[in-house]
Amino acid sequence: MNHIALFEPRIHFNTGNIARTCAATNTVLHLIEPFGFEISDKHLKRAGLDYWDKVNIVYHKNLQDFMNSIADGGQLYLVSKFAEHVYSDVDYSDDKKDHYFLFGREDTGLPEEFMHEHRDECIRIPMNDEHVRSLNLSNCACMIVYEALKQQEFRGLELVHTYEKDKLK
C-alpha cells in the first residue's frame, strides 16, 4: 500500500489537492502536526473538499509519532530536492509492501538532522533549480504516487470508466 505523509503542512490548498489524489488512488494520507491551517468542517467545505471523508487519514502529533507508526517491513522515502536518488529509479513494484513517501513543509522542508539520519531513503524529482526554488508540493506528491502505481500496474484502480454519455463513443 502507498502512503503520503505531510510533515507540518502549511498550505491548505496543497493538502486538499493531495487528499484528493489520495482518495482517487487509495493512498493513505498521514498528516503530521502542527498544521499551518485549521482542519474543521467549515474550512473543508469552504475549500470544496467534499470528498474528505473518503480519504484514509492518519493524524500524528509529531514526526516521531509518524515514524513509530510505520508498519514492519514498510519502506520510508524522504522526498527532497537535496537527495541524490531520482524517484523514478526506485523500485516500488511490490504492492504488498507499505511505501511511505514523506514530504516536508512547503517553506522549510524536512528537518536537516532527520534527513541526514535517513540519507539513503531520500529521493528527488529532477528539476532545473536555477530559476525555480522548488516544485509545488501537491504536484510532487501526485508524480511520485503515480510512479509507484505505474510500477504496481495500477492494481486496485479502474483503468476504464463507462459513462452513460461517453464523450469518446
From Swiss-Prot:
Function of the molecule: Could methylate the ribose at the nucleotide 34 wobble position in tRNA.
UniProt catalytic activity: cytidine(34) in tRNA + S-adenosyl-L-methionine = 2'-O-methylcytidine(34) in tRNA + S-adenosyl-L-homocysteine + H(+); 5-carboxymethylaminomethyluridine(34) in tRNA(Leu) + S-adenosyl-L-methionine = 5-carboxymethylaminomethyl-2'-O-methyluridine(34) in tRNA(Leu) + S-adenosyl-L-homocysteine + H(+)
GO MF, any single term: tRNA (cytidine(34)-2'-O)-methyltransferase activity
This protein's UniProt keywords: Cytoplasm, Methyltransferase, S-adenosyl-L-methionine, Transferase, tRNA processing
Subcellular localization, as worded in the UniProt entry: Cytoplasm
GO terms under cellular component: cytoplasm
Matching CDD domains: SpoU-like_TrmL
Residues noted as binding S-adenosyl-L-methionine in the record, renumbered to the chain: 79, 104, 125, 134
Descriptive protein name: Putative tRNA (cytidine(34)-2'-O)-methyltransferase
